[in-house]
Amino acid sequence: ILFTGGDPLFMKTKILEGYIDAILQADLPNLRTIRIGSKSLSYWPYRFLTDNDADALLALFEKIVSNGIHLAIMAHFNHPRELSTTAVELAISRIRQTGAQIRTQSPVLNHINNDPDLWATMWQRQVEMGIIPYYMFVARNTGAQHYFSIPLEEAWRIFRKAYQQVSGLARTVRGPVMSCDPGKVQVLGVSDIMNEKVYVLRALQHRNPKHVMKPFYAQYDPHAIWYNQLKPAFGKEKFFFE
């Protein structure tokens, strides 16, 4: 189960607890994990420190874990500066003490973090703080995409150069990834195959599990910033899963 939004941790704890309790009381046999996606650690770590219901929120996390369910906090950090305050260090420590695991994700954003050195620093710092680098996303095709997006090839090069700088403990991260119609599509690189320059892609998640982790190819387009701008390579009319 995934709680996302918006930001579900905008909710008061008693409201969130109502949803959680209903899930726990249902005693679902196939429920093993609850994920909560939130940027609160970066913009308001006091949600876990001094807010009126901060202790109640942490107690709720403990309750989830004590029921034998893995609780994953999917924390959004866009820049290493967001990891530099004492408040965020304390908040991360308090969350981890509940038994919850923190995993991190962020889009690569033009004007903000389109620099491999920033990503390497951020991932390494996250490991030092006991949290797990998880995803580098491509900026979604919504909102101010024209301002924040970068070409897919540039996103891949940023990911690759950052990945080369970190140890294996930080190489849990995957990217650059687009959350698009087929599922989660990762850009593995740019290559020349049969005299054609192509993007090499794969689906980390797909509506049809049979297609997960199977490579596929798109025509190289130096200006493409999203999946819907890609066309099948090698003269094919559609991708193999369409």
Spans of model-derived segments:
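Active-site groove signature of glycoside hydrolases
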Residues: 2-7
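Conserved AdoMet/S-adenosylmethionine-binding subsite of the radical SAM
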Residues: 9-154, 158-166
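Auxiliary Fe-S-binding modules of radical SAM enzymes
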Residues: 120-242
